[in-house]
Amino acid sequence: MFKENKVKLGIAPIGWTNDDMPELGGEITFEQCISEMALAGFVGCEVGNKYPRDTKILKKALSLRGLSIASAWFSAFLTSKPFEETAEAFKAHRDFLYEMGAKVIVVSEQGNSIQGQMETPLFDKKPVFTEEEWDLLIDGLNRLGDLAAEKGMNIVYHHHMGTGIQTTEEIDRLMEETDPKKVSLLYDTGHLVFSGEDHLHVLNKHINRIRHVHLKDVRIEVANKVREEKMSFLQAVKAGVFTVPGDGVIDFKPVFEALDAAGYEGWFVVEAEQDPAIANPFEYALKARQYIRETCGL
């Protein structure tokens, strides 16, 4: 399964140190994090809050361990701030990733987002964009796509819990109204299943737009509890709603089969934020690596 060297396996540092809740994994160093990634058998990663931003220092640390940068998250505010503000921050982010050799830029709209709010009920208070906000988002993403293309890069949109692009309908509209040459999709199994979507339907419908994949599993009993007890996104993460592939409810075999059949090329990034004091990140990275090897041969 998968053409040789066409798909690379990475892992996100958020399992070691959490960007939204820095107290989770606060004691874990950057060096420990990337050393354990490499030791677990991964060849790449995304960027966390403890990573040095000096590209020479970062390149050396990663190359010693055989790692490279797959991408990094960018928070857009296209619906809530002037475009120029997002564009300036985006260009700096783009240039950093370009220097690190990445080909795609993860973008998520954070206007009205509740994902970083500790007390806001995730499902009851989910933001919904107005028509005016949709127009700003679509136009802004197309323009960010143009800025990415200046460096031969692509933006991949990250649908995410607690944001205006979370559900199947919202993803469908985003894909329908953005320019396919300028805006691609980041496919995240965990966010779809947690939201209550049919992740295979979304995969098959938009498979030709997918340029980046996050492999994330869901503990369904925790997901149900989040709905019932009106928990926030951050409370859900602390409660363990997400875990690594093979440790939750999702069967990844049909996901891999569909992406293989479509000739997917790019990164698979294991991204499973949970409390490292409860779920040892190295142990869970090893679990994920073994499951992926057994399930699709990578």
UniProtKB/Swiss-Prot annotation:
It catalyses: scyllo-inosose = 3D-3,5/4-trihydroxycyclohexane-1,2-dione + H2O. It comes from the Bacteria. Signal peptide: none annotated. Keywords: Cobalt, Lyase, Manganese. GO terms for biological process: inositol catabolic process. Its EC number is 4.2.1.44. Pathway: Polyol metabolism; myo-inositol degradation into acetyl-CoA; acetyl-CoA from myo-inositol: step 2/7. SUPFAM superfamilies: Xylose isomerase-like. One of its GO terms (molecular function) is myo-inosose-2 dehydratase activity. Gene3D superfamilies: Divalent-metal-dependent TIM barrel enzymes (3.20.20.150). The keyword Mitochondrion does not apply. Its cofactor is glutathione; Co(2+); Mn(2+). It holds the Pfam family AP_endonuc_2. The keyword Translocase does not apply. PANTHER family: HYDROXYPYRUVATE ISOMERASE, INOSOSE DEHYDRATASE. Belongs to the IolE/MocC family. HAMAP family: IolE (MF_01672). This is Inosose dehydratase. The gene is iolE.
